[in-house]
Amino acid sequence: MTISKSLALSIFLSLNLLANTNSTAQNTNSKISKKEQVKSSLASYEKYIDDNNDTHLKEFIQLVSIPSISSIPSNKPDVAKAADWIVNKLKAIGMTTAQSIPTDGNPVVYGSWDKAPGKPTVLIYAHYDVQPVKESEWENPPFVPKVIDGKIFGRGASDDKSGVMISIWAVEAMLSKEGKLPLNVKFLFEGEEEIGSPNFKNFLIKNKELLHTDFAVTADDAQYTESVPAITLSSRGAALLEFNVKTANTDAHSGQFGGKTPNAVVAMSQIISSLYDKAGNVAVKGFYDKVLPITAQQKEIIKNIPYDPARDMKILGTTAEVGDTAFSPLERVWYRPTLEIIGMQGGYTAAEGHSNIVPGSAMARITSRLVNNQNGQEIIDLIVKHINKYCPAGATVTYKFKPGYASPMTTPSDTKEFNYVADALLKVYNKQPLKLGTGGTGGAMLSFKEILGVYA
């Protein structure tokens, strides 16, 4: 197994290009000399990656082995352990500063190298927290990473500990071979991205001076394929909600009480069914009211994507698509909002046995993906109003509101920074990078623009 050399080399080249954004015009000979120097450096960095592959693999397995699940309180010590591991790695590669900074939730890892006076500063963002796991659905334990056919299987190996480590290894290679970087670099690794970054905005506000930067890039996005580079320009926001339906103080015996006692699971099913129309569109009144039309630029981005919806259906094993067919599949995933039931629980659900009960309570969790011009609190209010309206007789609903709402984000593609990164990807992959949207959420991205004044 080898790390993504192409991505690492793209980081090398991007840093070199960004380092010269403020340079005055150079003569032709100077430009040629600089170009040859960068080419030589890239070859040197590539050799460094090859020579250190075994070490990097061991390091990566160590980090992925830490169950840094941010949504489960009992895993908080593991999240802190992962943060400390990254801090020690940053110190080992020679960063000027490396520390774990506390927040009201999980710590943020900060590292900097500031020995390039007069040169710009770039801030590289990623996150080290991961999603929870359902271990019964894993062929191998999710926190015992295993290499299969050249790929590492483990929770967080892709999202987003690879982003953390490839960024670090790229800087490590440059410091090892050159003893310096072409510009000043700051690392910012979050520990709460998977729960909507509830404390990240306040962290940026409190540390605005420390985090001052000329550019910001995120290492939390994917390439289109292993051989086709891409730059992600938009992400959806997210709002979360948990609600409980209660029909009785306890589960009841179906032989004694069935037929006259309200069933909480049935009531929950009725509520959930009311959230959608027959085509799968969200039926909550006002849900789509503030959604902006898809722009000509967004349509052009999708037009250039070699996307095959049948491939996704085959991978997932689905037999039909849902949603408004007036929009293409990618338009629905990137530029339209969603309301998903991400989990339900109620009644007797043990793996074996059969308990003859009338369930007295049920629970469901919702994630709503938001698009530009939608507000998370407004959407949650609309959903709550709808649930209250359609809650059947004999049932009551209580709510557990999740902290914070991640806003949608769009990054412009007409900036010099975008052009430098695109040029680096073109040189490394020998292919023009695709412009992508993502249906996922990067809660930190909008805060970068609002507080630090830079796009990421």
Residue ranges and their predicted role:
Residues 1-31:
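Bacterial Sec-dependent N-terminal signal peptides
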Residues 119-189:
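Active-site metal-coordination/substrate-binding segment of hydrolases
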Residues 26-77, 86, 93, 235:
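N-terminal hydrophobic or amphipathic helices/low-complexity stretches enriched
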Residues 248, 254-311:
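Polar, glycine-rich mid-to-C-terminal structural blocks
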Residues 59, 69-119, 143-146:
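A non-catalytic alpha/beta surface segment that caps or lines the substrate-entry region
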Residues 50, 61, 65-69, 88-95, ...:
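Sec-exported extracytoplasmic/periplasmic mature domains
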Residues 117, 225-226, 283-361, 372-385, ...:
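An extended, acidic, His-containing surface patch that forms the Zn2+-binding/catalytic region
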Residues 158-234:
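Acidic/histidine-rich catalytic neighborhood of metal-dependent amide-processing enzymes
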